[in-house]
């Protein structure tokens, strides 16, 4: 049986990993031009597959793995961009006002959690929520800034709050 001909009837995690790990790592190395990042993303990809219950539904293992790996890459890029922005902000702080390494790590984890929590919200919903919660703007100010009605802002913020609550319930936060 060829790599691509792995059927769902015979597909186990072990066979998926054994057959496709090398290929996925090579594909990721070409995409990322970094064997180190490729190895991390390949491992995270297979970890996500292992904890999911989707093995029986996989029709094309390589396409499936590429889809998961692309999501992991997006998460990595977002996390790196968030960390870079945070470190740049810290560099602008006066020397005595910078948080300790432990506080920095905790703050960065909180930012990453918030980013994950807001993932999946559309642009205006996410923006309305952030303007309300982080910038402290009123619904009227947000409506003006976004060019929408106050009623729309209320719906956006309510949707974002619901999304965050469901996220917290799902992940036990």
Curated annotation (Swiss-Prot):
Entries under PANTHER family matching the protein: RNA POLYMERASE ECF-TYPE SIGMA FACTO (PTHR43133), RNA POLYMERASE SIGMA FACTOR FECI-RELATED (PTHR43133:SF63)
Subunit structure: Interacts with FecR (via cytoplasmic N-terminus).
Family note: Belongs to the sigma-70 factor family. ECF subfamily.
Keywords assigned by UniProt, alphabetized: DNA-binding, Ion transport, Iron, Iron transport, Sigma factor, Transcription, Transcription regulation, Transport
Gene designation: fecI
InterPro entries, per the entry: RNA_pol_sigma-70-like (IPR039425), RNA_pol_sigma-70_dom (IPR014284), RNA_pol_sigma70_ECF_CS (IPR000838), RNA_pol_sigma70_r2 (IPR007627), RNA_pol_sigma70_r4_t2 (IPR013249), RNA_pol_sigma_r2 (IPR013325), RNA_pol_sigma_r3/r4-like (IPR013324), WH-like_DNA-bd_sf (IPR036388)
Induction statement: Induced 2.1-fold by hydroxyurea.
Protein's UniProt name: Ferric citrate uptake sigma factor FecI
Motif (Polymerase core binding): 40-52
GO molecular function: bacterial-type RNA polymerase core enzyme binding; core promoter sequence-specific DNA binding; sigma factor activity
DNA-binding region: 139-158
Record organism: Escherichia coli (strain K12)
GO cellular component: cytosolic DNA-directed RNA polymerase complex
Summary of the function given for this chain in its UniProt record: Sigma factors are initiation factors that promote the attachment of RNA polymerase to specific initiation sites and are then released. This sigma factor regulates transcriptional activation of the fecABCDE operon which mediates ferric citrate transport.
């Amino acid at each position: 049986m060829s790599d691509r001909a792995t059927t769902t009837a015979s597909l186990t995690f072990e066979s998926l990993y054994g057959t496709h790990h090398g290929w996925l790592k090579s594909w990721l190395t070409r995409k990322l031009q970094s064997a180190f990042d490729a190895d991390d993303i390949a491992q995270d990809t297979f970890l996500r597959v292992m904890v999911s219950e989707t093995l029986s539904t996989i029709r094309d293992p390589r396409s499936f793995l590429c889809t998961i790996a692309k999501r992991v890459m997006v998460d990595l890029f977002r996390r790196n961009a968030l960390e870079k922005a945070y470190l740049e902000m810290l560099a602008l702080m006066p020397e005595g006002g910078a948080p300790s390494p432990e506080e920095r790590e905790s703050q960065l984890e909180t930012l990453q959690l918030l980013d994950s929590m807001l993932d999946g919200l559309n642009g205006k919903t996410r923006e309305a929520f952030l303007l309300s919660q982080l910038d402290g703007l009123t619904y009227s100010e947000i409506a003006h800034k976004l060019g929408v009605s106050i009623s729309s802002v209320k719906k956006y913020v309510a949707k974002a709050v619901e999304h965050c609550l469901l996220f917290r319930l799902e992940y036990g936060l």
